[in-house]
Amino acid sequence: MKHIFLRISVIILFCSYLSTGCKKHEELPPYHAKGTIISVTGGCYGEVVLIEVENPPRIGLSGTFSFIGNTDKGVTYHNAIGVPYFSKSGIPDAVPQKVGTRLYFEYRNITEEERGQSTLFSPDPPIVCLAIYGPPSANYYIIKNIISFK
């Protein structure tokens, strides 16, 4: 009887261990995301902070981005969003805008008025570029609030 109880207990513990070992995406509230800054562009590429979003999946785009003349240091991403420089959307200076910073944030869609605003993703004052460069391909949003960062 002890052996049967022991075997059943071991099987239950083993199954519990397997079920907790599976990696699951936690359910975030609507318009909340977690991700890592993978690139910060400027100048002729536009002023964009590129964030690889881990959760929720499928809010961004996949692609590769590299600066002209530096193609061996390209950035490949699978679920990236682009946001304006933090200073342009009211995010405090205490939040570092540098590659590798992990963010948990609240975001929103860009309004039509903001879409027409030329300085949201561009340098102010405008600069003259000798060629046509473009920002990384990504879905673009506005960060409303940084909940945590590290």
Task: Name the predicted role of every residue range.
Residues 1-22:
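Sec-dependent bacterial lipoprotein signal peptides
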